[in-house]
Curated annotation (Swiss-Prot):
This is Chaperone protein HscA. One of its GO terms (cellular component) is cytosol. It comes from the Bacteria. GO terms for molecular function: ATP binding; ATP hydrolysis activity; ATP-dependent protein folding chaperone; heat shock protein binding; protein folding chaperone; unfolded protein binding. Transmembrane segments: none annotated.
């Protein structure tokens, strides 16, 4: 007979059937790993860290200190419970091995060339893009054959994917030690505006770390999971995510367990790191030291700035000492330095609200995510902008990892996913080029993903045997104003008259935001496809500018589109007429031929102009002149078809 199974409340009655999953917040400054235990999501600490300090005193920078109020914070990094959960996203390479986390972070001042931090900013970008965006990085870069960055270290060349893999590997080891088993899968969070290349790079890093990726999850969506499930809210909320290296604002509607992202915005090159660098530059000026070529001192200044920023979240003043100089910095001075950056985040919030079609008054709650939201000025300004006190009940450093852990627990099969539905969105419209340099949008902006759309297109010329598929991203009407994503060619089309072949083009965007495009000719089944992986990323500022430009140029774009469409129609009419005249010009009298030639000349003249209505009128005039010719051609075609056949046979 069956045995009665008894379990503790909150625990599964069949623990051997429970699969192990984790959520990973792969951050620019810090990373975390979380899991669901006894029905509750919690971040996992590194139990192997010493209680007193992270690394031996001889590895510290002698004499550097910061005084906040009466508290002395020495060069060593003291550990508290929160720091146990955080893993600095820093990797140090040395001849004997690789260090990740706190030890690597503290070695950055001693060996900056071999200590790689904020690698997330390099993910999916070309070397040229990285050098342009971040000209002061201390690393020795080399370009791979395809232009991607390679970093020279004491252990040889490494790329951003390999560096990220070391961070993921360390987090996975922490999770497996805590759970006493191998992970069945992980959910990794990424910024909402990571493009295809950046998302694919994250997946590749996870694969290199030996992890099975259940899903990539947008960071703001992960935060919504953490808060939405815990508090059961319904309505429109804003997720303000200001981390170390990226800023994201998302407007979400929560309704009966459905998480729908109404709009997103932000800046992939703005975060707490920028606050730190601004304060470090200020300290450098105050100390009167030249550090541009001394990466060690620059790192010391940066560490001091970070400690001062943290101290000023609690105290009004902090006394700092660096490079033989000692002085005081106040919260007011820090706020004056970072005020422009905070203002930039609020401008992005305003754009996101407009995109979502809601006002600040309609926002029920504002969720704060990211360690930089602890800065008092940030909380104050965000509260004033939305007219309500932001939510901070879940640790802003941990909320994303907690949301990822909840989603991982669902995807791995430990609980039914009917509790929750996630609807992320596409930030910019996706489409392809048509004749005349026009853009045909296939999937519009803010469409929820995963998504699939298909449209049919046809050939322009008689006997056309191939078609170039040009995939585009953007909101404008003309190809020249949009971003090119990829090109591929569909060959082997049947040699039919213009318009005879029918090509079905399908766009598919998966849950991770990766785009696949397939083109198939319906009668033959011949097809070609491509997976879009841009060689470098698209910043949030560029996305915002593309949307802004589309609004500012809406009227002129419509006019330009009408003009291009009329020119394409005119070209199609002229090409068709040219073929007809080549076959049946004998059906026309000299007077008729002259009238048609005159109408053709007028149409060609109007095509050179910029008046779409004039082109349309010229097309109609030519059509009127050729109606009798078309009727005669039809009669002649019928006579040829019936030649040699009796009435009975017909």
């Amino acid at each position: 007979m069956a045995l009665l199974q008894i379990s503790e409340p909150g625990l599964t009655a069949a623990p051997h059937q429970r699969r192990l999953a984790a959520g990973i917040d792969l951050g620019t400054t810090n990373s975390l790993v979380a899991t669901v235990r006894s029905g509750k999501a919690q971040t996992l600490a590194d139990e192997q860290l010493a209680d007193e300090q992270l690394i031996a005193d001889e590895q510290l920078i002698a004499g550097e200190q910061l005084i906040a109020g009466q508290q002395l914070i020495a060069g060593q990094q003291l550990i508290n419970e929160k720091q146990r959960d955080l893993l600095p996203s820093v990797v140090h390479y040395h001849p004997q091995g690789i260090d990740v986390g706190w030890k690597a972070r503290n070695l950055a001042a001693l060996d900056p060339v071999n200590t790689i931090s904020s690698v997330k900013r390099m993910m999916g970008r070309s070397l040229a893009d990285i050098v342009q965006r971040y000209p002061n990085l201390p690393y020795q870069f080399h370009a791979s054959e395809n232009g991607l960055p390679m970093i020279q270290t004491a252990r040889g060349l490494v790329n951003p994917v390999q560096v990220s893999a070391e961070i993921l590997k360390t987090l996975a080891q922490r999770a497996q030690a805590a759970l006493a088993g191998e992970l069945d899968g992980v959910v990794i969070t990424v910024p909402a505006y990571f493009d295809d290349a950046q998302r694919q790079g994250t997946k590749d890093a996870a694969r290199l770390a030996g992890l099975h990726v259940l899903r990539l999850l947008n960071e703001p969506t992960a935060a919504a999971i953490a808060y939405g499930l815990d508090s059961g809210q319904e309505g429109v909320i804003a997720v303000y995510d200001l981390g170390g290296g990226t800023f994201d604002i998302s407007i979400l509607r929560l309704s009966r367990g459905v998480f729908e992202v109404l709009a997103t915005g932000g800046d992939s090159a703005l975060g707490g790191d920028d606050f730190d660098h601004l304060l470090a530059d200020w300290l450098r000026e105050q100390a009167g030291v030249a550090t541009r070529d001394d990466h060690g001192i620059q790192r010391q200044l940066l560490d001091t700035a970070i400690a001062a920023k943290i101290a000023l979240s609690e105290a009004e003043t902090a006394v700092v000492s660096v490079a033989g100089w000692q002085g005081e910095v106040t919260r007011e001075q820090l706020e004056s330095l970072i005020a422009p950056q905070v203002k930039r985040t609020l401008m992005a919030c305003r754009r996101a609200l407009k995109d979502a079609g809601v006002t600040a008054d309609e926002i029920l709650e504002v969720v704060m995510v990211g360690g930089s939201t602890r800065v008092p000025l940030v909380r104050e300004q965000v509260g004033q902008f939305f007219g309500r006190t932001p939510l901070t009940s879940i640790d802003p450093d941990k909320v994303v990892a907690i949301g990822a852990a909840i989603q991982a627990d669902i995807l791995v099969g430990n609980k039914p996913d009917s509790d929750m539905l996630l609807l992320d969105v596409i930030p910019l419209s996706l489409g392809l080029e048509t004749m005349g340099g026009l853009v045909e949008k296939v999937i519009p902006r803010n469409t929820t993903i995963p998504a699939a759309r298909a449209q049919e297109f046809t050939t322009f010329k008689d006997g056309q045997s191939a078609m170039m598929i040009h995939v585009l991203q953007g909101e404008r009407e003309l190809v020249k104003d949009c971003r090119s994503l990829a090109r591929f060619t569909l060959r082997g089309l049947p040699p039919l008259p213009a318009g005879g072949a029918h090509i079905r083009v399908t766009f598919q965007v998966d849950a991770d935001g990766l785009l696949s495009v397939t083109a198939m000719e319906k009668s033959t089944g011949v097809e070609a496809s491509i997976q879009v992986k841009p060689s470098y990323g698209l910043s949030d500022d560029e996305i915002a500018n593309m949307i802004k430009d589309s609004m500012a140029n809406a009227q002129s774009d419509i006019t330009a589109r009408k003009l291009a469409e009329q020119r394409v129609d005119a070209a199609r009419v002229l090409e068709s007429l040219q073929g007809a005249l080549a076959e049946d010009a004998a059906l026309l009298s000299e007077q008729e031929s002259a009238a048609i030639a005159q109408a053709v000349a007028l149409l060609q003249q109007q095509m050179q102009g910029s008046d779409p209505q004039a082109i349309e009128a010229a097309i109609k005039a030519l059509d009127a002149q050729t109606q009798d010719f078309a009727a005669r051609r039809m009669d002649a075609s019928i006579r040829r078809a019936l030649a040699g056949h009796s009435v009975d046979e017909v």
